[in-house]
A protein has these predicted regions:
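N-terminal start-of-chain detector that recognizes signal peptides
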Residues: 39, 100-101, 138-140, 149, ...
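Terminal alpha-helical anchor/extension segments at protein ends
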Residues: 14, 19-20, 172, 195, ...
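Repeated scaffold domains used in trafficking and secretory/extracellular systems
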Residues: 43-54, 78-90, 113-126, 151-163, ...
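A short beta-strand motif characteristic of beta-propeller blades
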Residues: 33-44, 71-80, 105-115, 143-151, ...
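Short beta-strand elements that form the blades of beta-propeller/WD-repeat-like
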Residues: 48-68, 83-97, 101-104, 119-132, ...
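Extracytoplasmic/luminal low-complexity segments enriched in Pro/Gly and acidic/polar residues
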Residues: 195-197, 201-354
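Glycine- and small hydrophobic-enriched segments that form the cores of compact globular domains
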Residues: 130, 139-213
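N-terminal "mature head" segments of proteins
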Residues: 1-114, 140
Length: 354
């Protein structure tokens, strides 16, 4: 097989998509134009040797996890039969029993063993284990040993962590946040709905703010802030149409905007001004990523068999979107590029201003 010819053919549809994006951008009333340029497309089966010092970006596509480099080398692709978790630092594949789990560094060397029963979850350089029964979780250290744990009487329905804290939402409508050492920092129940389940939660990078989608039948979106030993609600609004599944909530890096997936829309709240905006997006939002300069927001959503990437400028203004069909997908940002995974292929698109 002529791989170079195949690679060129794969870039053609992506180039067409971004030519359309260029036309859309060029009619925007902006002082600059943002250009998207296709760089490469690789199949995850094309494994190449790579220096350990090179940046490795994690991916998950269907039943495959692994790492690739910004210059287009697929470093590893591991097929897992049941469940897996991956971050820039570690990866692990595990079965249904979940009695103990070996986990590995990105280069494939053993990092440690998690002896806690349950399903491990890696979030950047943080390790958690969701324990059997669904009401308890464990925070582990970098070797997989238990640092602290917490058990509630009601099942965990939403979870989030950041550098400075962890937040969990529960089926009884309670939201609890924890300091990095496991001490409870905030605990409150938003209420206001006929069914008070927490369907989505996020904690800000500094650990001071928590946002959640709360309840059904008079569903609300709420942002709370630490105020002494209490939690102060700094924003709330009722949602006209309730969502009935777990949903994504995410702060931007500076915690001045928070995003959430409502029923066929993306909700955006400016936490400094206590203002909100809704952008129509059908289906389920699976990822929200930010460019390194924080000027662009990329939103990946899926409606039936169609994926859509929606691009926002200045945190709230829709600029463009494009769609494609696929069985699985992901997006990642790094420096001045966005990486898009689709089925068994990964593509790099560079971003520039001219």
């Amino acid at each position: 097989m002529n791989f170079n010819k195949k690679k060129k053919n794969l870039l053609i549809p992506i180039a067409v998509i971004f030519c359309v994006l260029y036309i859309i951008f060029s009619v925007q009333p902006m002082g600059h134009e943002i250009h998207f340029t296709p760089e490469w497309t690789e199949d995850i089966s094309h494994i190449q040797e790579n220096s350990n010092n090179t940046k490795k970006i994690p991916f998950k596509l269907s039943q495959n996890i692994g790492y690739f480099t910004p210059d287009g080398k697929i470093v590893s692709a591991i097929t897992f039969p049941f469940k897996s978790t991956i971050s820039e630092k570690w990866y692990a594949a595990f079965g249904a029993s979940g009695t103990k789990t070996d986990f590995f560094f990105a280069d494939g060397t053993l990092a440690g063993t998690i002896n806690e029963a349950g399903f491990p979850f890696f979030d950047q350089d943080r390790i958690f284990v969701m324990q059997p029964g669904g009401t308890a979780f464990v925070k582990c250290d970098s070797e997989g040993k238990c640092e602290w744990n917490y058990e509630h009487y009601s099942p965990i329905t939403a979870f989030s962590s950041s550098k400075n804290g962890t937040a969990a939402g529960y089926a009884d409508g309670t939201v609890i946040s924890f300091l990095p050492d496991g001490k409870i920092d905030q605990k409150f129940a938003p209420g206001g709905s006929n069914c008070d389940v927490i369907l989505g939660v996020a904690i800000s990078e500094n650990g001071n703010r928590i946002a959640c989608v709360s309840g059904q039948d008079q569903q609300r979106f709420i942002v709370a802030e630490k105020n002494g030993g209490h939690s102060k609600v700094i924003f709330h609004e009722y949602l006209e149409n309730s969502i009935s599944r777990q949903t994504l909530v995410k702060f931007n890096n500076n915690s001045d905007y928070v995003y959430y997936n409502g029923k066929d829309f993306l909700g955006i709240v400016n936490t400094k001004k206590s203002t909100s905006k809704k952008i129509p997006i059908k289906g389920k939002i699976s990822q929200i990523e930010f460019s390194d300069d924080n000027e662009l927001v990329f939103v990946l959503s899926k409606d039936e068999e169609k994926y859509t990437v929606t691009i926002l400028e200045s945190f709230i203004y829709p600029m463009a979107s494009f769609s494609f069909e696929g069985e699985c997908s992901f997006i990642k940002t790094y420096e001045n590029s966005i990486f898009i995974g689709r089925n068994t292929k990964i593509s790099k698109i560079s971003i520039s201003k001219k």
